[in-house]
């Protein structure tokens, strides 16, 4: 259930409820380690990011309130008619709809998984705001450390993202849209040629409507389609399906 109201300054306040348990430390830790400077800002209890929807830029902040099992969200965006879409993306990002108690109850029946489930109850699968952004990150993350991938994706965002001015410190630009990276010169940024070509191919196919990483394709259709792109292997395709398509059966 969510409630919303317009706050002074044009921000909309939302309250998204979730069913416990929820391992907030694991969720925010995962997102923080992979945060794109200037696009995302993560603390021990909050997550914030810029976004672009239907050509209009905005941002949101999410504050986790474990005692009340709520996520308090402030959205700054000029078109309230798209608020429903924004809420759904935020829910998917934090895997809000997961019934963690039921999932843990099932997994604890496995003798090998049981100790981990008992130690870390309420683990959820982090989603994403943008399937394209995630695909770029996944491609750049091939055969390198998470830290190295974060460095590369931050270079792309800083050079080709649109400047953004909001009221949240650390949010300075939006991640570049596919059309921007179709023509972007990514040489000299430390990215190998095959990955540059893969990013450009994904962007081109999204622009032509041949690929959909926003829920318009199921995993059975999406994985073979994106795997046709040179430089995108099974792990990358399954990872994108797991986080962008919210497929519980995807297995990177």
Regions found by a protein language model. Name each.
Residues 1-252:
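HhH-family (HhH-GPD) DNA N-glycosylase catalytic core used in base-excision repair
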